[in-house]
Amino acid sequence: MTEAMKITLSTQPADARWGEKATYSINNDGITLHLNGADDLGLIQRAARKIDGLGIKHVQLSGEGWDADRCWAFWQGYKAPKGTRKVEWPDLDDAQRQELDNRLMIIDWVRDTINAPAEELGPSQLAQRAVDLISNVAGDRVTYRITKGEDLREQGYMGLHTVGRGSERSPVLLALDYNPTGDKEAPVYACLVGKGITFDSGGYSIKQTAFMDSMKSDMGGAATVTGALAFAITRGLNKRVKLFLCCADNLISGNAFKLGDIITYRNGKKVEVMNTDAEGRLVLADGLIDASAQKPEMIIDAATLTGAAKTALGNDYHALFSFDDALAGRLLASAAQENEPFWRLPLAEFHRSQLPSNFAELNNTGSAAYPAGASTAAGFLSHFVENYQQGWLHIDCSATYRKAPVEQWSAGATGLGVRTIANLLTA
């Protein structure tokens, strides 16, 4: 094992020879990061990415100034999907070290799960990984049910069954109940619903290669809400929360769904399929119906749902939609506390009517006359939330995954959003 490179923090600027914009300098003792007080966490993360780019795979965070947030910022930039890295952490008090360890365990799980190849991570594997993670932190406070394949059709989960039936790997619904009260009649405080499309070819509305090559990550919403529940549990969540993961492949076969098909949901809504690549909303609808039936105080769904959200925000922010201004404000406050990027986009009553169909109550995609694709997708989902005007948040996970590295992130999953949702659950 090579000797660790020492990484220290300084509030003094770098020597002028490094240039006026230098954020780090190198000497015989190691590497010094020069904090300027403006965006110290971002500076640390960007510097860590550069350090990894130098091929330095063993570091020691040394000296004064390190806390859990700064250590975590370093790790966010330093971690990458290829190769191994070792960090020797500084001395932290027990609470800060526990917080850091929980982030490393759970958010790394989210990133690694999203990065996993689709060949290794099908619908059943995703559901089981989620069960294993939550059980690891919650023990016997968790019960769950897995429904798959034809059982979904027989029980009326027609959106999930329709999307997933084209794959040899059966679609799966995971319904997990975290109940720390021990009372089977305890009210459900919150429901989390995640889109778990383990590979999205687009179906017969097939994607081009440039848009399909990252579609192993189309289960990012499911991984995010799973991680959020696990992380909230480590922070002392003492209320009952249910998790619904809607897991499927969206593939082409002789049994795959087709344009013009009509799906009838358990709440009576009929949906005409006019784009098989708008499948995420079709599977989420089943999860939202189940969530609404629990009568929780809040429902949060998360999905890598639309390209429109990425067009608006890039990969830098998660898009937030809600009719509930107070609840949206609470989530944005949680995001600010956790230093995670969320941005609210419009969702109005008229978006709910911008999915007209000649043959059903709803179309699963908007027409050229209604180009606000992220907002109309949220409007579609609202039809499956019983009390959509209160207590419902929709997160379009545009910051979940990066196809290419940037100055602060490696290629792949980011894990962003986990801490924000956990913060809201435990507030």
UniProtKB/Swiss-Prot annotation:
Entry cofactor note text?
Binds 2 manganese ions per subunit.
Q: Which cofactor does it need?
A: Mn(2+)
Q: Which InterPro entries match?
A: Leucine_aapep/pepB, M17_PepB-like_N, Pept_M17_PepB, Peptidase_M17_C
Pfam families per the UniProt record, alphabetical: DUF3663 (PF12404), Peptidase_M17 (PF00883)
> GO terms for CC?
cytoplasm
UniProt-listed CDD domains: Peptidase_M17
Q: What's in the keyword line of the UniProt record?
A: Aminopeptidase, Cytoplasm, Hydrolase, Manganese, Metal-binding, Protease
Q: List the disulfide bonds.
A: none
Q: Name one GO molecular function term.
A: metalloaminopeptidase activity
Q: Its catalytic activity?
A: Release of an N-terminal amino acid, Xaa, from a peptide or arylamide. Xaa is preferably Glu or Asp but may be other amino acids, including Leu, Met, His, Cys and Gln
Binding positions for Mn(2+) 1 per the UniProt entry: 200, 277, 279
List the subcellular locations. Answer: Cytoplasm
The EC designation for this entry is 3.4.11.23
> Mind listing the GO biological process terms from this record?
proteolysis
Q: Which residues participate directly in catalysis?
A: 207, 281
- Give the top-rank taxon of the lineage listed in the UniProt record for this protein: Bacteria
Q: What are the binding positions for Mn(2+) 2 in this chain?
A: 195, 200, 218, 279
Family under the similarity heading: Belongs to the peptidase M17 family.
Report the protein's function: Probably plays an important role in intracellular peptide degradation.
Q: How does it assemble?
A: Homohexamer.
PANTHER family xrefs: LEUCINE AMINOPEPTIDASE-RELATED, PEPTIDASE B
Its protein name is Peptidase B
**Naturally occurring in which organism (per UniProt):** Escherichia coli O9:H4 (strain HS)
